[in-house]
């Protein structure tokens, strides 16, 4: 049983979060361990497992990005791992975390990497270059703006996905799915860029 089925929901991305929360509390009371105190060990274990599933499902579905990522995995999509934890883990083992640069960001990323390398070199020598710092802050602001636009684009795609699910329009569903994958990967990459700039400016 997947998380949507657990809450008796269609695979929609625009959910009524308040209704979801209300249902969560109803199910939480129903599955509370105290209600199974006099039951068999098997029933108690089943209740604990259901309660754990409930918590995981609610935590995932109440967050729109986590909800989208989860739905895409249900659709058989493997998202690019570009999280901070994955990147840090690669660094800790001496490896290099491979990140796929969104094509539209190639030029900006190339320039940013040069600026970051210069900033790190300056810090190692105990120097500070105000102009370079201003350039990095400007770049960070630009990436923050792109993050906001990415969120707006995702909002549109969520509605397109839901409409395709309701109408059974498979081509529209696949188009929305592929576009969401690209946007989530772009969002993840942008977050890492902003983090790198913040670390360089510390």
Predicted regions and their residues:
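C-terminal accessory/regulatory regions appended to core domains
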Residues: 1-202
């Amino acid at each position: 049983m997947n998380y949507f089925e657990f809450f008796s929901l269609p695979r929609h991305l625009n959910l009524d979060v308040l209704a979801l929360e209300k249902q969560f509390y109803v199910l939480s009371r129903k599955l509370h361990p105290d209600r199974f105190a006099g039951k068999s060990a098997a029933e108690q274990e089943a209740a604990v497992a259901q309660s754990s599933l409930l918590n995981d499902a609610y935590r995932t579905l109440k967050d729109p990005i986590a909800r989208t990522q989860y739905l895409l995995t249900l659709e058989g999509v493997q998202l690019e791992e570009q999280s901070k934890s994955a990147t840090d883990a690669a660094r800790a083992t001496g490896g290099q975390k491979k990140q796929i640069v969104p094509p539209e960001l190639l030029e900006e990323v190339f320039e940013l990497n040069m600026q970051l390398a210069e900033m790190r070199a300056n810090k190692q020598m105990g120097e500070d270059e105000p102009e370079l710092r201003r350039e990095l802050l400007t770049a960070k602001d630009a990436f923050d703006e792109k993050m906001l636009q990415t969120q707006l684009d995702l909002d549109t795609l969520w509605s397109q996905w839901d409409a395709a699910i309701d109408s059974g329009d498979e081509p529209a569903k696949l188009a929305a799915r592929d576009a969401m994958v690209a946007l989530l990967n772009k969002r993840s990459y942008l977050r890492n860029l902003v983090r790198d700039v913040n670390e360089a400016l510390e």
